[in-house]
Amino acid sequence: MALTGSWKLALEEGGKSPKTIVSYLASVKALADFLARNRLPDDTELVGAQAIRAFLVAEIERTSAVSAQVHYRNLRVYFGWLAREGEREAANPMQLVDKPSAPPKVKPFLADDDLGKLMKACSGTSFEDRRDTALLRILIDTGVRVSGLAGLRYHSSDDSLTDVFLSQRRLRVRLKGGRETWVPVGAKSAAAIDRYIRARARIPRAADSPWLWLGTRGRGVDHMTDSGIRAMLKRRGNEAGVQGVHPHRFRHTFADNWLAQGGSVDDLMHIAGWTTYDMPLLYAKGRGIARAHEAHQRLSPGDRI
């Protein structure tokens, strides 16, 4: 497949995240490999809908329908770019390809008991305990993406260099594509962040780092990235006896808890950083029936008569 280098430059110009760009390019490479294995034309002008359908079917059999859906979405972007750039005179083949269907997958939520066990696992007073408690509190309280959480900055006196505003009980979080949003936090989360910041101040050279979350390595400090947060959650999950603890489970759990407590979809969209109603509807599916039954028990019209 041609022009992937040019497409990569266009994606970078459009502000796509490195992770998204890797996914896009991987889909084009997977299609190119499929075409080569099956001795099909791989010229961008000659690739047709039938070949792409065959590729997606093969991906469903080899991996999963969800993986095929990712390739479908990414290839729509690629062939759309080719058309806009005038690099393909033939019609966009993706207009004739249907999105692969996948059975709805119920996302596992973290029960309140599991969240309590995780909090207990880091209830000590060490630097790591203070840090991990604050991280857990924010994840439970906001469902923030791990990339936005890891990217929080901190400065004790310069508002332009910090994303932490505890007096206002809110955080400035960077979203996909470079957008920013203000995420509110509750009193317990704010107190946990404050305890961590005080512990952070006692770490040598902590003031030299622009990042809120620090890891300690020997006598130095380093930025705790999203992979570090993932590793911490796995470790704390093992300590607490809670399996499968990862950032996205907190996001699903937060959305479910928000809606179960009567929170509005519009407010959920703002806090989660979503711009369309598709995402809250997707996240709401998992326990939608259970929430509806719980709401009916609270609001039953018949019980008022």
Protein language model annotation of sequence segments:
Residues 1-305:
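Conserved catalytic core of the tyrosine transesterase superfamily
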